[in-house]
Amino acid sequence: MRREMPYTAGLGERYGYATGYRATSHPSLPNYLAMSGGSTFGVTDDHDPSAHPLAAQSVFGQALAAHRTATVYAEDMPGPCFTTSAGRYAVRHNPWTYYVRERAACRRHDLPMTGLSADVRAGRLPNAGMVVPNTCSDAHDCPAATADAWLRTVLGEVMAGPDFTSGRLLVVVTADEDDHDQGNFVLTTLVNPQLHHVVVSSPLDHYSLARLYAEVLGVPPLQQARSAPSIVSAFGLVVGPGH
């Protein structure tokens, strides 16, 4: 990874990264559900939302219910909360579209990535957010170097914005799953001005990421995130509604 993704590796060395972070399963979709809902909900495939209408709460819906903000930015998505794949947009990588009780909120706040730059410049990035690259930018269909260049562009802009420079924004860079060759360990880097050369070897997973959303929002963790190891504790972060 250091050779193929030097920018991303450098971020981890400058701020922090986890060496013991695992995905929860294969294929992609169950991992995104674990991140966003604290459970795989028994899903074992990558089918569209029409096959898996989840009557559960997501971290994004939980944020809105707590009067906080939530936005998903999906690269190349044809329209808000788009529930089928199109071109390089893969709906299996956009988990909010599966939570059918939150579909109205999804249509308002699950948006094409074209709106990200304006929100960065205005300092209005959400309390609970996710950026979903297309299947080239995420290295699924293109080399890892392509993903590294994409991250350099996107994170360079985000890290120059007021949400990050003020210390309010924590960025987590992770992957849904490994290539079936690494024990499902996945690259996970944390970027925030609080962090300086932090390396965490303790076990973490996508349920830990769902718990992180809850800890940032100041709300109870969902499903299996309740018992997941805490990223906040592991990295020594200070988070919550007052931070």
Residue positions per predicted region:
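Flexible, surface-exposed loop/gating regions in the mature catalytic domains
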Residues: 1-243
